[in-house]
């Protein structure tokens, strides 16, 4: 079975409304519809969480769970799918 550890994806995006890189694209999840994605700020607080991330509608656009824009900077993620977990960072720059 395919593993996320075999795939690279961009760690940054620019949700500024210009139509380019406005959301965090995670291509591997196109193959694993059942997944969980959690975004954590530098203080360890979960700021965004979802099930079934799909890169189309259900995707991280640099906003928290209330729809407020997050500050530019580095955030951490936990990606869970297919009984695997990947952790890393993602950078927001508007």
Predicted regions and their residues:
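Short loop/turn motifs at secondary-structure boundaries
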Residues: 1-94
